[in-house]
Amino acid sequence: MSKVYLVGAGPGDEGLITVNGLRLIQKADYIIYDRLINYNLLNEKKSDAKLFYVGKEGMKSSWKQEEINNLLLKCAREEGKITLRLKGGDPLVFGRGSEEALFLKEHGIASEIVPGISSSIGGLIYGGVPTTHREVSRSFHVFTGHTMDGPAELDWENLAKMEGTLIFLMAMSNIETITNKLIAAGKNPDTRAAFIYKATRSDQRRFITTLKDAYECKCNNDIKNPSVFVIGDVVQFADDIDFFAGRPLKDRTFILLRKKEFNQDFKDYLIDNKAEFLELETIKYTPIHDDDFDKALKNIEAYKYLILTSRNAVEFFFKRALELGVDFRRFYNIKIASIGQKTMKDIEAYGFKADYVSEKYTSDEMIKNITSKFEKGTKVLYPHSDKAKGNIRAALSDYDVDAFEIYKNSDEAYEKMYLEDKVYDIFFFSSSEAISFNKFYPELLKKARIYSIGPYTTKSIEALGYKVYKEAKVHDSEGMIDLVKEEINYEE
């Protein structure tokens, strides 16, 4: 039976989604998502899940609510499919989730709501502002600053008399009205207030002010949505509680383009330093089935050497060997050559040791290693991608080489995502990543800080017309992390 889940993704930091919300992302067949979610969450989807972007920016949207409702209905009517409506914050806190749930109910569609952390609470926390404090505020009240018909019509006299913390969402276009109405209704003009812009994100900004100066603060600092506006004595604790302001990489958003399985060490480093990042897999890697390659695997004893130049090559080579039931004990006489520590460790995960490891992550270094250590005239097995340069194969003219394309790189299945128009730090681990990213996001590359893993990737980037900001001295993941460390030292 089909079902729709309305899931809150939290205020922006991907780590703030609930366990159940993440589980449903991993199960969903259709994901209908908004602008303010963290896009890394979409990397958790099934490989065949279909994405629909229906985001709104301010009060503008290419999707009307009626159209979103109809899309939900269309997906939900697919028998046996799970539809996920992924919304920023909590789906029922000014998120139109209740409207969508009622619409589905009217049309006989089963739905379930998974709460999320609202920016009205989580956003304040990241700004160092508690919603309550027993000495100064025993309650909090959340309001929308904008309705479908314009500025929210509220009982200002009642609001001005309320004890506790007043929190306004979606209010940036009406700050002057809100502050003037509250002051006119008797609220103390010197009451503390604060704005938290893009709460929990790398470019979060916090501005401390007072009720009477809030509009001027908003104008002088060009504060826009998404922002939380808070009024109350709890603001006095902001500097003492703030844990987010001292980030060494604030304002920076790093884009990683490798398969997410290969990014864990890089992600851990960025998370430890409270840096924001996006994982965008613009390239899909799929196996190429070749009868001749299968015959080579079944006759593996015939080879003296095996060349594995990438982590993908390791994965597809050993997966195919396992699928064919090849007994790994038959590899006893084979010497394995690889590039880099990560590729070596992937080989070890299958129970093998790399005999020759090129520490520099370049094919030239690999060629030097092979030609100086391989016995000439012997049989060599060289599985590689369909995009592999021909230089390694060409350098092996003195050997009896069987080279096979065992996997292909393709960006045909990639669905372009909405990315903010800003300066990103983009890390390219291969030429194919650069070529693919340029196909989808050339406007972002024009002003990005571009990092390259090595000289071949740098040449490809420059051939596309872009300048490389930094190239890794060590051509592997650790070398790329070192470039981030340089940025931290520079910022400090």
Feature map (PLM): residue ranges:
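Class I S-adenosyl-L-methionine
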Residues: 1-14, 19-117, 122, 220, ...
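Structural motif
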Residues: 3-6, 29-30, 49-52, 81-85, ...
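Signature of uroporphyrinogen-III synthase
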Residues: 5, 11-12, 49, 58-79, ...
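Class I SAM-dependent methyltransferase SAM-binding "motif I" and its flanking Rossmann-like core
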Residues: 13, 90-162, 207, 356-362
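Short beta-strand/turn micro-motifs composed of small residues
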Residues: 33, 87, 115, 144, ...
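A glycine-rich beta-strand to alpha-helix segment
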Residues: 69-125, 164-179, 191, 379-401, ...
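A short alpha->loop->secondary-structure connector
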Residues: 105-108, 131-133, 184-190, 324-330, ...
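Conserved anion/nucleotide-ligand pocket segment
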Residues: 147-194
